[in-house]
Every structure is written in structure tokens, then in C-alpha cells.
């Protein structure tokens, strides 16, 4: 018995088989991603898809400076408010910048009809030609073109008027009917502006236009309207009890616009031949202009990023990432990062992919660790690693390309009478934004789940590749490792790694070693059987003696009576 036990212990102590393990890369990365099933999964490599930083500056867009309206707004600029005179020389821009507190708009009080629509039209204009549509001196010879000034539009301490409009008044005590027209020969849309004056009393009406009842008629192929002045006393605004209403239209190439009036016309002086450009827009910002270039501008600052998403601002100009409400959009490209404890088991095997990754393998994602008489070491499987890198890179690029629809997103304008429409529009925009955010987050969650499963599958495939080569020349010992039944030097190990392992060459040696191990197992089984028999007999004897002693004690004190009946 002692001899058999000694054989078993010696066999176990002498075992020092060659081993090969399959595992994957690990590092000191702290990147975390989310998947459909898990939150904050630590991974070896990942890419960020969400831009959350800007430079806080206004920059040139693709080398072209923006039009800064400074203290003026769109109305003051396009009508020619005297306080906005410095803007008259501007001809082209990449985008238009208003400030939140711009104060110079319509200097003479009144309504600007369809002003929000005009802003929308101008948001797509990148340049224009400002030209005299009706020359001041020759177009209105029977009317006064110089006395139409007001303290409401003062400039340098003197009464003045809009630089793009003419306030026509009586001349030599007369205001004859006027009839003038313009044919658009510019080859592009022309923006034409005019106004109608509404005096506060009949006296002013007669003084300015020499008649109590007047009209203004404006006609083109797509515009036809007749205006009648509304004479009424009103609260003073900017010192004026009268009002001027402002109007505009876009004149198509070849179209004609005709003006007919017998009073109260604020006539066009300058008009604008518009050139539209992709990527232009209007933003409201307090940021200052700097010497910098960008492809994407927001009211908060410029974004220089190729990422598909941003959470900085929903209003953007240029080639910009899509705005989402997310705070994190990170796509995994590597593997789960679970560095294993580099402990050695009974046979000295390094823990494999079941327990964690290997920080010692730095030249690939998947690979091997071997140990034999010549030593031990890591080696990456370059083919499977490269195939995985190519596949994941293509996937990431595809996701970025599909989601990276860069565009301008400007805010919509509504007047005070369109509050319900504005609220509805905000709800619709919020709904679309929620959908975009949900789609982006769901896409990343799904792709992260697929990528991690893809890596797990690649490790398993590599394991099955080794297993199919070794067959019964080695045994699985767990942790992604195999223990050879034969000696496997470095050349042998290399053949396993590159798929050229010669199974027949080592099968005889493996068979003999396998039989020896099986014999030891059989001997040990005999030892275990003898021990089991002895243990059973001894336990039975102890039980019988115990029962006899208890019975004798109980009979002696009368607790148990024994009767034998014949």
C-alpha cells in the first residue's frame, strides 16, 4: 500500500509538461464604454465620437471672415440705418453675426413685414451686389428726395434717413402721381425694399404729400399689393407719433417690379443682387472675432473636429457635427480590459483568456503564451489581430461616415404673433433632437456589444484552431491552456502557432506518455478502493460497538426490557 501511494506522489511531483495557452491583450487603459447589457465596461482601446470643446472665438469660415453687425441687427443693416453706415461696404461673408443686445434696427418706428422670413432668406446669402435700383437724382424729378429726414434716424447729431431708401415728399407745393419700374437684368434674385408712411394727423399728411387720401401700389409677377395710409394719433416712439411700415420682395431674373403712388411712398434707392452659398447662416453671439480659421462655427465658439457628434450648441454654421444631448458617445475598438493575475498553477501555466488578458503581450490583440524546457514567452497571432483591426476600423469609419452628415443648423425666427407656431416648432425640434440622440446612443451601444462579442469569438476561434491541431497529443487544463503529452520545443511551438503542427510526428510519444499517466491513474484507483473498504469496515465496527454499549446501559437501569418468547 505504501509503495502504491509513493508511486502516485512521485508521478505528480515529477510532472513538468510543456504547455501552450491562448489569450488576449490587456493594458493599463481606463477607457470605459457602455453596451446594451452593461455600463462602464473597461476596454483596452476606444474612440470618442462626441465633441464637447470649442475655442470660445469667432473665426473665419474656410478663410472667409464673417459679417459682424455689431450694434446693428439685420433690419438696421439691410435698410441702411445711419448708425450702421460702416456696414454698407460689406459685399461678402461666410456667416452673419448679431449680438443679443443689438439696438440699431428700424430707427423710424413701425412694423417690418415678414421680417423673420427675410432673415431666413438672408441666412443663405454669402454675398450680394448693392446697386442703385432707382437713382436718386434722375428717378424722381418731380418729387423732393432730400427733405425726407427725421430726428429718429439722426447721424452725427443731425437728422438723417435710411441709406437704402428715399422718403419722397412734395416739391414746389405739388406731389404728382408717380409711376416707375425696374427690370431685373442681374441674372440672379434681387432684394427690393420699400416703405409706406402713416402720419399721425391730417396736417402732416397734407404738408408732406399735398393730399389727404393717398395710395401706394407695388406689382410684380409674384407680388401685388395696394397700400392705403392709416392716419391716426399714436404713442410716440423715438419721438415720433407717426409710423413707417417696411416691405420687401425677391425679384426673379427677367421680372419687372412697378411702383405707383400719389403719396406716402418710401421709395427704394438701393437694392441687392443676391448670391447664395452653402453653409452660410445667421448666429447670435457675444463672442469676439479672432485671427483663426474653422470649418464649424457655433455661437459659443469654433469647433475644429472631425467627430460626427457634438453637444456644444444646436445652432451651427459650416461643416459641423450633429448636435445631440448625450454626454458620452465612446465606441470600443479594443477588447475588454481585464488584466489577469500572473500566477502560476500546478504546472506553471499562465492564466489564459478565461481569467483575463495579458499585459505582457503588446504586439497584438490575440496570441499565445508557451512554456517548455527552452523557456517561455508571448507571441501575438498577427493574422487574426490584423483581420480584427481591419474589420473594426472599417466599421468605425462606416459609422462616422453615415452619422457625420455635416451641415448648417440655424435657428428659426418667429414674430410675436406666431408664438403658438414657435412653441410648436420648438416641440418638433426637441422631438427630432431626442430621436437623433436616441439613435446615436443606441447605435453606439449595439456596435459596442457586437465588437466585444466579435473579440470573444476571435479568441474562441483561435483556441479551437489549436485544439483541432493537437487533438489527443495534448489535454485541456483550463484557463485556455493545453498540456502536451510530448516534448514540444520552440520549433514545435511555432508550428502550433502558424498552423503547421505535425500531429503524426508526435502521436507515438504522446500515446506512450498518455498510457503511463493512465496506468498511474489505475494504480491510484486500486489504492483508493482498498482505503474505501477498510474505512467502511472500521466504521461499521465502531457503530456496532456503540449500539451494544448503549443497549447494555439501558437494560441495566431498567429503561430497556428484553423479552424472548418461544
From Swiss-Prot:
One Gene Ontology term of the molecular function aspect: host cell surface receptor binding
Cytoplasmic side: 551-566
Residue intervals passing through the bilayer: 530-550
Cystine connections: 21-481, 59-292, 72-84, 107-153, 296-320, 488-492
Compartments, record wording: Virion membrane; Host apical cell membrane
Main location class: virion
InterPro entries registered for this protein in UniProt: Capsid_hemagglutn (IPR008980), Hemagglutn_HA1_a/b_dom_sf (IPR013828), Hemagglutn_influenz_A (IPR000149), Hemagglutn_influenz_A/B (IPR001364)
Ranges facing Extracellular side: 18-529
GO cellular component assignments: host cell plasma membrane; membrane; viral envelope; virion membrane
Site positions for Cleavage: 344-345
Cleavable signal peptide: 1-17
Record keywords, A-Z: Clathrin- and caveolin-independent endocytosis of virus by host, Clathrin-mediated endocytosis of virus by host, Disulfide bond, Fusion of virus membrane with host endosomal membrane, Fusion of virus membrane with host membrane, Glycoprotein, Hemagglutinin, Host cell membrane, Host membrane, Host-virus interaction, Lipoprotein, Membrane, Palmitate, Signal, Transmembrane, Transmembrane helix, Viral attachment to host cell, Viral envelope protein, Viral penetration into host cytoplasm, Virion, Virus endocytosis by host, Virus entry into host cell
S-palmitoyl cysteine: lipidated positions: 555, 562, 565
Physiological role: Binds to sialic acid-containing receptors on the cell surface, bringing about the attachment of the virus particle to the cell. This attachment induces virion internalization either through clathrin-dependent endocytosis or through clathrin- and caveolin-independent pathway. Plays a major role in the determination of host range restriction and virulence. Class I viral fusion protein. Responsible for penetration of the virus into the cell cytoplasm by mediating the fusion of the membrane of the endocytosed virus particle with the endosomal membrane.
Note: Major glycoprotein, comprises over 80% of the envelope proteins present in virus particle.
HAMAP family: INFV_HEMA
Record's subunit section: Homotrimer of disulfide-linked HA1-HA2. Interacts with human CACNA1C.
Name recorded for this polypeptide: Hemagglutinin
Designated gene of the protein: HA
